Amino acid sequence: MHFGTYMGAYWIFKFILFPLGFTIPFLSFLYLSLTLGVPFLGYHYAKTYRNKVCGGVISFAHACLFTLFMYMFASLLVAVAHYIYFQFIDHGFVLNEYSKLVDEASKILQRTDEEKEFIRNVIDTARTLTPVDFTMQFLSWDVIVGSLLAIPTGLFVMRRGNRAETPNITPQP
C-alpha cells in the first residue's frame, strides 16, 4: 500500500511531536494541526489514486475500501513507532506530564474531591498498562477512526464513468 506508507510516515512524524509538545507548546499546536489535517490528506491520496490508478473513475465501495486499507496500513506502521516509543524511550514521561497537568488544572479549577480522586485513579490505572497495551489501544483507535473516515472520503472521491464511454459488457452463457 503505497499511499498507506506515506500516511504512516506522516502519522509517525506527527507522533514524534506529541511528547515534545509537553515541553514546547508550539509543537503541541503543530501536532493538533497535523492531526486535523489527516482527513484532508486521506482525501488527497484517495483522489490521486482515483485519477492516476483508476483512470478517473472509482465507485463508492472501491474508494471506501482503498481509504480503509490506507488507514489500516498507516495504523500498523505507526503502531510499530508507538511500541518502540513506549517500550524504549518514554519510561513514564507522558503519564508524569499528564499528572502534572492535572495537578495544575486542579489548582486553577475548583474540583470536588471525588473528581480529583477519579482522575488520580485513571492515571494510576494507566501507569499499570504495558507498552503493548498502549500500542494496541492506539492501534484499535486508529483503525476505528480510519474506518469512520473512509465513509465520507469514499463519498467525496467516488466518480462514476460516462455511460457513453463504458462498454456494454454482457455475460456470456
Predicted regions and their residues:
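Transmembrane alpha-helical insertion/packing segments
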Residues: M1-R50
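Membrane-helix interface/capping segments
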Residues: H44-H62
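Alpha-helical transmembrane-segment detector that highlights a single hydrophobic TM helix
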Residues: S59-M72
